[in-house]
């Protein structure tokens, strides 16, 4: 499976998946149709599916245009998002398995950012498409879910193999890591990552994908059990730590 990262809107990423052996393609969270159509034409590929992680407009904005162009495609999304994802044809729940080309995706239910948010994990290739749940150095805002839900979702993703590639849907890494340094300034791995990300962004390079291992070492939202971070935010439990981190990040 080939993965192509496409820029969209201001800071969104669309991911186009291509199986060269069959010539089929799928797209994850298409915000706009134009970059998707251009890449399909370049590859000579046929779009077979849309994989939506949640219902927000900047993740489903191209659904109607793409299904108009390719009326036979399947549009996947959470069963909790029924009626909120345009053109949705398949309603997924935790534990479902979705085939694509020579591989498949396990569906993970990761509410918090929204009440129906899901992620797509391909264990055979080690790829995770997590939408707005886990970001490089951060996590999504809580629009519909609770801190406890989001912490549970992040802990679920934290259990994936450390080499898992994390394909999140926004380029927020630099600001997220800048915030992370305010609560864990003495973390050398975090310092090194932030310096590298600053160099990459100065050259217009993407910081996605990261890995689960890197996030566990540098992302404060996956480190809520670390005592120094708890002390930095005046908390004593992982949930209290997460809640205070999220509040501070919202104001950063």
UniProtKB/Swiss-Prot annotation:
What keywords does the record list, in alphabetical order? Hydrolase, Metal-binding, Zinc
As to how many cofactors bind and how, the note says: Binds 2 Zn(2+) ions per subunit.
Molecular function, one GO term: metal ion binding
Annotated residues for binding of Zn(2+) 2: 58-59, 132, 170
EC class of this enzyme?
hydrolase
**Residue numbers binding Zn(2+) 1:** 54, 56, 113, 132
What processes does the entry annotate via GO biological process terms? methylglyoxal catabolic process to D-lactate via S-lactoyl-glutathione
InterPro entries hit by this protein = Clx_II_MBL (IPR035680), Glyoxalase_II_hydrolase (IPR050110), HAGH_C (IPR032282), Hydroxyacylglutathione_Hdrlase (IPR017782), Metallo-B-lactamas (IPR001279), RibonucZ/Hydroxyglut_hydro (IPR036866)
A Pfam family that this protein carries is: HAGH_C
Taxonomically, which superkingdom?
A: Bacteria
- Reported EC number(s) for this entry are 3.1.2.6
Pathway assignment reads: Secondary metabolite metabolism; methylglyoxal degradation; (R)-lactate from methylglyoxal: step 2/2
Report the catalytic activity: an S-(2-hydroxyacyl)glutathione + H2O = a 2-hydroxy carboxylate + glutathione + H(+)
Q: Which NCBIfam families match?
A: GSH_gloB
- Description of how the protein assembles with itself and partners: Monomer.
Family statement: Belongs to the metallo-beta-lactamase superfamily. Glyoxalase II family.
What name does this protein carry? Hydroxyacylglutathione hydrolase
């Amino acid at each position: 499976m080939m993965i192509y990262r496409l820029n969209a809107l201001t800071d969104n990423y669309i991911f186009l998946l291509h199986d060269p052996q069959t010539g089929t393609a799928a797209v994850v969270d298409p915000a706009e149709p134009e970059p998707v159509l251009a890449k399909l034409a370049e590859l000579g590929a046929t779009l077979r599916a849309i994989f939506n992680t949640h219902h927000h407009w900047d993740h489903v904005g191209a659904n109607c245009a793409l299904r108009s162009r390719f009326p036979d495609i399947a549009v996947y999304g959470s069963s909790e998002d029924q009626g909120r994802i345009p053109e949705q044809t398949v309603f997924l729940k935790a534990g479902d398995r979705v085939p694509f080309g020579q591989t498949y995706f396990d569906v993970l239910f990761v509410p918090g950012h929204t009440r129906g948010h899901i992620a797509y994990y391909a264990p055979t290739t080690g790829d995770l498409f997590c939408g707005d749940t886990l970001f490089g150095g951060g996590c999504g805002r809580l629009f519909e879910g609770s801190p406890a839900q989001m912490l549970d979702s992040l802990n679920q993703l934290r259990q994936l193999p450390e080499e898992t590639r994390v394909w999140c849907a926004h380029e927020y890494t630099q600001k997220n890591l800048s915030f992370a340094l305010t609560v864990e300034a003495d973390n050398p791995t975090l310092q090194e990552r932030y310096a590298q990300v600053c160099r990459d962004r100065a050259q217009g390079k993407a910081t996605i994908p990261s890995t689960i291992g890197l996030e566990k070492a540098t992302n404060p939202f996956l480190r809520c059990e670390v005592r120094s971070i708890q002390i930095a935010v005046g908390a004593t439990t992982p949930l209290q730590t997460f809640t205070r981190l999220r509040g501070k990040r919202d104001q950063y």
